[in-house]
């Protein structure tokens, strides 16, 4: 029973009161193996063996810390998003002069995406085998699959890209592009569902950009209608949710950038709150709330019956927050959303790219133990 909220209860389905965004710091052995593979010193098969061994350790560590659903830490990825998107049918990863967004105080390797054919998803996508492998390692424990939101493909290829030229199929037909992307995700969802997936998280930085005044100004000056783009993205998400099996939970994580503890967007949720929270039918939102860059809780007034996973604990630093302050912020959020619609997690993953954030593995796990202790105090064991 909760010590603070008499009516607070635990949850037995995703998202959980104690949850995570998904990525973890890569162990040095994995970083070394990836470097050796890129240099040709070991084979891809050798790298996979190292990945398998490290993911198996990670899965056990997640179980031991009390997580109800485990991830592979995104250990097989370079980026949180490009690896998945570039392997879609009709998409190609290309070099770029600069990364599509500028992080504060740091630079990312310049890669981007191009749409070269009809968008689709096939069973040859490498994430299918990755999921099978993780499912075996997890055993009876639930697996959580994290992939970039469909919005990200459209954002990178058409909105951020100032030189975007649609292929013939999508010329003067953005609606067809939106539908093809959504249909590809529905195909992916169904394939993963057949493999046992019941917990799917869509990671998304588009909404973080749409919260930022400077980003909104830049896009508007280019003649882009951000309000319509936001509605288009909700359309894609709702088309996917409408096609999902009843026992599959689909959540979305909204991010403002997470590369080596840096960020690229700032601004509260108010500009997107009514469109996203009021109309998007996902089962839950993982929301960054670890700094004043995320604004206050007032935008949560648009939440309907979804779960809101409060990202009150930063993953950008190893320093532990003050427990009383975190509980006070949960109480503040509960003024807008019922306590039984709230959960707690880190603000983002610990390593959205293979470089990872600036903290140690020990600090990473202490963060999760800290979150679990707060969850037990607020919602009970």
For each of these PLM feature ranges, what is it?
Residues 2-381:
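Domain-level signal for soluble alpha/beta catalytic cores
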């Amino acid at each position: 029973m909760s010590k603070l909220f008499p009516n607070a209860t635990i949850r037995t389905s995703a998202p959980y009161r104690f949850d995570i965004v998904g990525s973890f710091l890569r162990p040095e052995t994995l970083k070394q193996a990836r470097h050796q593979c890129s240099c040709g010193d070991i084979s891809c098969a050798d790298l996979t063996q190292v990945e398998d061994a490290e993911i198996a350790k990670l899965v056990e560590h997640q179980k031991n810390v009390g997580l109800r659903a485990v991830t592979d830490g995104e250990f097989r990825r370079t980026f949180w998003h490009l690896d998945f998107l570039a392997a879609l049918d009709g998409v190609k990863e290309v070099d770029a002069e600069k990364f599509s967004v500028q992080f504060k105080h740091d630079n990312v390797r310049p890669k981007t995406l191009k749409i070269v054919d009809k968008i689709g998803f096939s069973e040859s996508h490498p994430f299918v085998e990755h999921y099978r492998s993780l499912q075996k390692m997890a055993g009876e424990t639930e697996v959580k699959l994290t992939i970039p939101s469909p919005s990200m493909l459209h954002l990178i290829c058409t909105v951020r890209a100032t030189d975007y030229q649609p292929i013939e199929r999508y010329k003067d037909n953005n609606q067809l592009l939106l539908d093809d992307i959504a249909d590809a995700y529905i195909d992916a969802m169904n394939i993963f569902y057949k493999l046992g997936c019941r917990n799917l998280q869509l990671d998304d930085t588009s909404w973080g950009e749409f919260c930022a005044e400077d980003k909104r100004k830049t896009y508007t000056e280019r003649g882009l209608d951000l309000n319509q783009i936001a509605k288009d993205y909700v359309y894609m998400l709702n088309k996917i949710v409408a096609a999902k099996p009843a026992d599959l939970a689909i959540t979305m994580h909204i991010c403002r950038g997470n590369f080596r503890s840096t960020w690229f967007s700032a601004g509260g949720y108010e500009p997107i709150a009514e469109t996203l929270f009021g109309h998007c039918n996902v089962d839950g939102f993982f929301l960054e709330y670890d700094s004043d860059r995320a604004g206050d809780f007032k935008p949560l007034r648009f939440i309907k019956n979804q779960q809101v996973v409060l990202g009150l604990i930063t993953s950008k630093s190893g320093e532990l927050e003050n427990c009383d302050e975190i509980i006070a912020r949960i109480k503040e959020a509960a003024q807008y959303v019922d306590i039984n619609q709230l959960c707690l997690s880190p603000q983002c993953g610990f390593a959205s790219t293979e470089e990872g954030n600036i903290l140690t593995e020990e600090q990473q796990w202490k963060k999760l133990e800290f979150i679990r202790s707060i969850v037990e105090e607020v919602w009970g064991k």
